[in-house]
């Protein structure tokens, strides 16, 4: 069932002029709405879309810049770690070298002291031997002079040697 036959059948007349006027009015109204309402609304929506696109693009650029900065910071941090590790290694090597030098110097000093002590011992031993030789020589001369002074028999000579040895033992 169609609406048009019912309206016509109800005694309402169909007027083509009115319908044409309403159609033209409707088209004018649509044109005005498009120009003054829909056009600015679409322009606002387009501007909003452009603004959002720009903001997204700006955010992506900032995100990329942040990533680059993070990568740069990580590279700098890695470089700093490598440099500090290198400094630590150099300090360890220097410490080892200094330790070796100190040990070497201490060994050389100990060897020098041992040599000095050895030469001192040899010197004192030589002095003691020289002094002992001098004493033996003087004792020999003294014994010989006493023997020569007295022509003694064997018993008297033995007694003289024993007395002399006692005398030497007491003088020490």
Swiss-Prot record:
It is found in: Cell membrane. Belongs to the ATPase B chain family. The keyword 4Fe-4S does not apply. SUPFAM superfamilies: F1F0 ATP synthase subunit B, membrane domain. The keyword Methyltransferase does not apply. F(1)F(0) ATP synthase produces ATP from ADP in the presence of a proton or sodium gradient. F-type ATPases consist of two structural domains, F(1) containing the extramembraneous catalytic core and F(0) containing the membrane proton channel, linked together by a central stalk and a peripheral stalk. During catalysis, ATP synthesis in the catalytic domain of F(1) is coupled via a rotary mechanism of the central stalk subunits to proton translocation. CDD domains: ATP-synt_Fo_b. GO terms for molecular function: proton-transporting ATP synthase activity, rotational mechanism; proton-transporting ATPase activity, rotational mechanism. Its main location: membrane. This is ATP synthase subunit b. GO terms for cellular component: plasma membrane; proton-transporting ATP synthase complex. The gene is atpF. Keywords: ATP synthesis, Cell membrane, CF(0), Hydrogen ion transport, Ion transport, Membrane, Transmembrane, Transmembrane helix, Transport. It is a single-pass membrane protein. F-type ATPases have 2 components, F(1) - the catalytic core - and F(0) - the membrane proton channel. F(1) has five subunits: alpha(3), beta(3), gamma(1), delta(1), epsilon(1). F(0) has three main subunits: a(1), b(2) and c(10-14). The alpha and beta chains form an alternating ring which encloses part of the gamma chain. F(1) is attached to F(0) by a central stalk formed by the gamma and epsilon chains, while a peripheral stalk is formed by the delta and b chains. The chain crosses the membrane at residues 12-32.
């Amino acid at each position: 069932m169609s609406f048009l036959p019912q309206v016509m059948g109800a005694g309402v007349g169909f007027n083509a002029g009115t319908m044409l006027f309403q159609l033209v009015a409707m088209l004018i109204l649509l044109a005005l709405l498009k120009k003054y309402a829909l056009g600015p609304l679409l322009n606002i929506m387009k501007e909003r879309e452009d603004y959002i696109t720009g903001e997204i693009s700006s955010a992506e650029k900032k995100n990329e810049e942040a990533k680059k900065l993070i990568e740069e910071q990580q590279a700098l941090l890695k470089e700093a770690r490598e440099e500090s590790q290198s400094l630590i290694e150099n300090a360890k090597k220097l410490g080892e070298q200094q330790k070796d030098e100190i040990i070497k110097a201490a060994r050389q000093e100990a060897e020098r002291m041992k040599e000095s002590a050895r030469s001192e011992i040899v010197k004192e031993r030589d002095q003691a031997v020289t002094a002992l030789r001098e004493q033996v020589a003087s004792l020999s001369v003294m014994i010989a002079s006493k023997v020569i002074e007295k022509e003694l028999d064997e018993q008297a000579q033995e007694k003289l040697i024993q007395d002399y040895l006692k005398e030497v033992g007491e003088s020490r």
